[in-house]
């Protein structure tokens, strides 16, 4: 406890805090002296914890790397640093170019898929348009009884393979016959489609000509009517 008058600006609590600090300092000094005398004093290292984390470590590594080590000429060290810098720049540029290539390849794949899809849809529409003309002219063919059917050479070969029990050859020849018949059907359908298209175009052109003639005739009739009315006036 403090006895006596206190200086201005202080109170008893401040004096007590100061006395406590003095006692802690004295006790720490005594402990240090005792440790030195006993030989049991241990050194404690203060470890600074980095506040910025890995960025400060990277900066420290860069600074340590930029320092020229002992025993190496300065010009050689500068040349080595320039080469290292160029190598790192090449790595970054290569990584960027790889990313760009990946993006381009993805765009190219999407574009190819869209083109293939559009081509497939257009081919499907054309096929549907042709299939409606399959067998259109078959009604004009003569009946089967009156029609004299002659087998082709391929059909005769199929019959021969069946008689010889050569199933593989018969299947191969039958596939060829089916593709040939399909090709004939497609050719007939294309011819029919072209004929219908040409007929529609001719009809449309004829209708357009008639419309033009009607328009000119109406105007001439109107002029004639106006002239005749003027004659009566």
UniProtKB/Swiss-Prot annotation:
**Source organism of the structure:** Bos taurus (Bovine)
List the taxonomic lineage: Eukaryota, Metazoa, Chordata, Craniata, Vertebrata
- Stretches of Acidic residues bias are at 13-24
Task: Name the keywords, alphabetized.
Answer: Coiled coil
As recorded in UniProt, coiled-coil segments are 144-164
Chain intervals with Basic and acidic residues compositional bias: 34-46
What is this protein's gene name? FAM204A
**Which parts of this chain are annotated as the region Disordered?**
1-57, 79-127
Q: What is this protein called?
A: Protein FAM204A
Basic residues compositional bias: what residue ranges?
98-109
Q: Which InterPro entries match?
A: FAM204A (IPR037690)
């Amino acid at each position: 406890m403090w006895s006596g008058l206190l200086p201005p600006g202080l109170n008893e609590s401040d004096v007590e805090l100061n006395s406590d600090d003095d006692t802690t300092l004295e006790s720490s000094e005594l402990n240090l002296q005792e440790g030195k005398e006993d030989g049991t004093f241990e050194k404690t290292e203060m470890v600074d914890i980095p506040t910025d984390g890995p960025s400060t470590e990277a900066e420290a590594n860069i600074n340590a790397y930029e320092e020229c080590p002992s025993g190496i000429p300065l010009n050689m060290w500068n040349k080595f640093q320039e080469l290292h810098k160029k190598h790192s720049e090449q790595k970054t540029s290569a990584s960027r170019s790889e990313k760009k290539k990946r993006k381009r390849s993805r765009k190219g794949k999407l574009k190819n898929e869209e083109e293939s899809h559009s081509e497939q849809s257009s081919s499907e529409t054309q096929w549907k348009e042709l299939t409606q003309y399959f067998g259109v002219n078959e009604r004009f063919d003569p009946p089967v009884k009156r029609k004299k059917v002659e087998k082709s050479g391929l059909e005769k070969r199929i019959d021969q393979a069946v008689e010889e029990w050569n199933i593989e050859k018969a299947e191969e020849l039958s596939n060829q016959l089916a593709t040939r018949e399909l090709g004939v059907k497609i050719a007939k359908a294309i011819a029919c489609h072209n004929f219908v298209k040409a007929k529609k175009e001719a009809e449309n052109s004829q209708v357009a000509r008639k419309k033009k003639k009607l328009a000119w005739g109406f105007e001439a009739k109107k002029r004639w009517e106006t002239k005749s009315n003027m004659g009566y006036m």
